[in-house]
Structure formats: structure tokens, C-alpha cells
């Protein structure tokens, strides 16, 4: 199982480019394309979100609570899939250092670690 996480969403748009482009929309488009490609190749996938919405719990009121709840729910979704691989899509922005750019890849090499 490959869990595809389109980072941010809903009220949490993530980084915003100089032209006003919001990260969460780009993340979702990339995640949907990746999902389609992996399914075409015969992989079993699950997406954390399929629309511009966060997945926070009903009790979350403030933006801080919503972000914390959203992250907690994403982790729970991944952990519920035994042996899952997580691909979390993000676009980072560092306006103070425009030379900093490119892909980042993080992975957990410890089996069973949270």
C-alpha cells in the first residue's frame, strides 16, 4: 500500500509563491497525478485527501488546533495501513534565499518506527 499525502489543504494553504500560487493546490494536483500513475502500474494506493480540504477533527476550533488535528489524522491514516509506504507531497519556499530550491526526499529507515 502506498499512501499519498497531498500536503496542507483547506484553511492551511502552505507556502505562497510571489505570484500568489498556493502550495496546497499544487500538492493536490501532483498527488492526483501520482495516484493515477501508480494505479496504472498496478499499485494499491490511498490518498489522505482528494479535495482542497484539511482532515481535522470536528472539535478543532483554532487554526493551530486544526493543523495539529489534521497532522494527527494523517499519521493515523498511514499507521492504519500495515506496511504502508508514505509519499507526502510539498512545495517549499524560502524567499530570503532564492537559490535554495529543488526536490527533497525524507524516509524512515527504521522498521516499525513512528
Regions found by a protein language model. Name each.
Residues 1-20:
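Short glycine-rich His-centered loop
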Residues 21-114:
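Active-site-proximal helix/loop segments of hydrolytic enzymes
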Amino acid at each position: 500500500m502506498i499512501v499519498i499525502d497531498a500536503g496542507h489543504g483547506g484553511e492551511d494553504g502552505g507556502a505562497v509563491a510571489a505570484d500568489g500560487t498556493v502550495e496546497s493546490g499544487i500538492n493536490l494536483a501532483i498527488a492526483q497525478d501520482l495516484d493515477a500513475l501508480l494505479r496504472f502500474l498496478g499499485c494499491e494506493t490511498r490518498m489522505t485527501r482528494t479535495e482542497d480540504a484539511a482532515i481535522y477533527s470536528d472539535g478543532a476550533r483554532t487554526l493551530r488546533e486544526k493543523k495539529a488535528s489534521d497532522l494527527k489524522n494523517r499519521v493515523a491514516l498511514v499507521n492504519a495501513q500495515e506496511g504502508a509506504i508514505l509519499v507526502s507531497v510539498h512545495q517549499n519556499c524560502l524567499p530570503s534565499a532564492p537559490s535554495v530550491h529543488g526536490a527533497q526526499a525524507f524516509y524512515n529507515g527504521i522498521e516499525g518506527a513512528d
